[in-house]
């Protein structure tokens, strides 16, 4: 199934947290927090301005982003978990 977000919404796939720390400590599932980093899968057309035109989005498909722990709405599509969030919920784009 293909999803196209509406307005200024963004579809994000969470990136999995590391299983082992740099020091070699294995992190059990019960101690893991939800990662606040993800990849942008799809982007809506942008917020609608007063003149009827869409404002340009600051993120695009493929961007790695940081977001608030409680951002977005969790959805499941074809047994995969995603977040749908507003662009305002994205804190930063990670540049390589």
Curated annotation (Swiss-Prot):
Gene Ontology annotations for the cellular component aspect, listed alphabetically: cytoplasm
Pfam families, A to Z: Cpn10
Record-linked Gene3D superfamilies: GroES chaperonin
Protein origin, superkingdom: Bacteria
Keyword presence, Cell cycle: no
Listed CDD domains: cpn10 (cd00320)
Swiss-Prot/TrEMBL keywords: Chaperone, Cytoplasm
InterPro entries given in the database record: Chaperonin_GroES (IPR020818), Chaperonin_GroES_sf (IPR037124), Chaprnonin_Cpn10_CS (IPR018369), GroES-like_sf (IPR011032)
Molecular function terms from GO: ATP binding; metal ion binding; protein folding chaperone; protein-folding chaperone binding; unfolded protein binding
SMART domains: Cpn10
Subunit record text: Heptamer of 7 subunits arranged in a ring. Interacts with the chaperonin GroEL.
Entry-linked PANTHER family: 10 KDA HEAT SHOCK PROTEIN (PTHR10772), 20 KDA CHAPERONIN, CHLOROPLASTIC (PTHR10772:SF63)
Family the UniProt entry places it in: Belongs to the GroES chaperonin family.
Protein name, UniProt field: Co-chaperonin GroES
Upper taxonomic lineage: Bacteria, Pseudomonadati, Thermodesulfobacteriota, Desulfovibrionia, Desulfovibrionales
